[in-house]
């Protein structure tokens, strides 16, 4: 144990390996590309006739969306356990702004590999994913690489893992997308929709938005401790993330209002 400018209870005996991080990131990006390329084969051969029939009737654009969901789902399942472990250990050792261990290295490696894949997909077909998702991919990769740079490390490293816990909403979102294609009238569609709404609003809005503000405040409190360039990048990305989560939360709440709470009856038309 040691202390840096008043930051106590931090483990400094862990050696972060740059070469291992870069190798792992490339390895996982290759894995995600392989899954993406083989997604159609996996879907048509390992998920039963009902799923196969639904998938084969999709347009090429819809098939690409399905394949992207497969990769997104696998990334969420892979990274979430390491995010939770990292978050618990970061809180345990006293400062979520400054900590590093094997779990955090895995979080950075898996998510960097995913964001490399994601950014290339966005570059190849930007109209398919949309501007907000392109910004999301750029932010994800740039923040991962920047916190892994040697100067000032491990400042902000734990926060990457904590913020990626919001990927928990990705799982029901993708399940909703899969079920909508296979059988939109299934009771599981409504269950997955409800799970998505709850996990998204709780993780990204109710907790996420105040947490973004806290992170900026915490960064300012440590202004003299961490490298200025990393602090500026961190604050900028927190601001963009706050905007994106606010925007997505607004769209979701608006959709819920229009669907369930719209005060104007749908049958009311052309009254005299």
Swiss-Prot record:
Membrane topology: Multi-pass membrane protein
Domain TLC as annotated: residue spans: 61-261
A Gene Ontology term for the protein's cellular component: endoplasmic reticulum
TM annotation in the entry: 16-36, 71-91, 103-123, 128-148, 155-175, 196-216, 233-253
Any GO BP annotation: lipid homeostasis
Keywords: Membrane, Transmembrane, Transmembrane helix
Cell location: Membrane
InterPro entries tied to this protein: TLC-dom, TLCD
One Pfam family hit: TRAM_LAG1_CLN8
Family as reported in the entry's similarity comment: Belongs to the TLCD4 family.
Identification of the protein by name: TLC domain-containing protein 4 C
Species per Swiss-Prot/TrEMBL record: Dictyostelium discoideum
The organism's taxonomic lineage, starting at the top: Eukaryota, Amoebozoa, Evosea, Eumycetozoa, Dictyostelia
The encoding gene: tlcd4c
């Amino acid at each position: 144990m040691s202390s840096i400018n008043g930051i106590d209870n931090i483990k400094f005996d862990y050696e972060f390996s740059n070469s291992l991080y870069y190798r792992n990131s490339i390895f996982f990006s290759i894995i995600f590309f392989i899954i993406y390329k083989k997604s159609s084969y996996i879907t048509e051969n390992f998920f039963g006739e009902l799923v196969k029939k639904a998938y084969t009737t999709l347009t090429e654009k819809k098939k690409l969306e399905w394949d992207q969901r497969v990769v997104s789902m696998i990334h969420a399942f892979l990274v979430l356990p390491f995010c939770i472990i990292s978050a618990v250990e970061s809180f345990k050792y006293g400062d979520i702004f400054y900590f590093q261990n094997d779990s955090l290295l895995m979080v950075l490696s898996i998510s960097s590999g995913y964001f490399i894949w994601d950014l290339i997909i966005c570059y190849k077909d930007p109209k398919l994913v949309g501007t907000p998702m392109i910004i999301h991919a750029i932010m994800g990769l740039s923040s991962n690489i920047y916190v892994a740079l040697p100067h000032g490390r491990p400042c902000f490293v734990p926060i990457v893992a904590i913020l990626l816990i919001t990927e928990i909403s990705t799982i029901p979102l993708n399940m909703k997308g899969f079920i909508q294609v296979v059988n939109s009238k299934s009771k599981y569609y409504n269950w997955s929709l409800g799970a998505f709404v709850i996990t998204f609003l709780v993780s990204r809005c109710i907790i996420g938005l105040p947490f973004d503000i806290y992170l900026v405040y915490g960064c300012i409190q440590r202004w003299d401790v961490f490298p200025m360039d990393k602090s500026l990048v961190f604050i900028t990305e927190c601001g963009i993330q706050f905007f994106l989560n606010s925007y997505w939360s607004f769209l979701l709440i608006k959709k819920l209002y229009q669907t369930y709470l719209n005060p104007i009856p749908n049958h009311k038309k052309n009254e005299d």
